[in-house]
Amino acid sequence: NNKFESSNFIEWDWLSKERLNIDAKKIDSVIFFPKPSSMDEKGYINGFINSSKNIYRELCNLPINRFISISSTRVYNKQDNKTAHESDEISAEEYRGKIIREYEEQQESFYGKKLIILRLSGLYDSSLNKMSKNFIHRKNAALAIKFFIEKDFNFTDCEIFNCSEDSANSSISNKKIKSLGFSFQQYN
């Protein structure tokens, strides 16, 4: 469903040259879900780096309470069998992981302590099989976003959370988000 009925919802093409017209006294949450414009390096740069610069240009003078940036566990270089944690040093070797990490750093410089980064594992829904050992159902991704919109944690710095469901083969830790009280639901 591409329709969202709400007077408090704004949709905008973040690669557009059009200016975003917002007259707001307070914005509780902005959720940015970047998407590559194509699957090559240029598409990733457009979808992550250029689009987030455009959004920042439009929002930098607005009173935003929290900015939720959707990211990916692709930033982890998973050549070993160790479990990846949010505090691990990032050493992405392929262009997608490097660009996504650059995007995260850019977002942190833009939004500072207002920023929450959610690193999603491979998205699936009920019509798709879980295709990797690290995954998250689309509904759990939406629930994680909702969790951070509804809770007021008052973080003192940018916070990053891995969003990956429990599985016997998972190499991505989800302990940090679960320690705040988030529960992953089970979907077929």
What annotation goes with each model-predicted range?
Residues E5-S29:
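Conserved Rossmann-fold cofactor-binding substructure of NAD(P)-dependent oxidoreductases
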Residues N54-E93:
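Conserved Rossmann-fold NAD(P)-dependent oxidoreductase catalytic core, especially the SDR/UDP-sugar
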Residues N77-D80, S91, Y95, I116-S132:
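Flexible, glycine-rich beta-alpha linker
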Residues I145-F148, D152-N169, S173-K175:
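A recurrent short beta-strand within the Rossmann-like NAD(P)-dependent oxidoreductase core
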Residues S171-N188:
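C-terminal amphipathic/interface module of NAD(P)-dependent oxidoreductases
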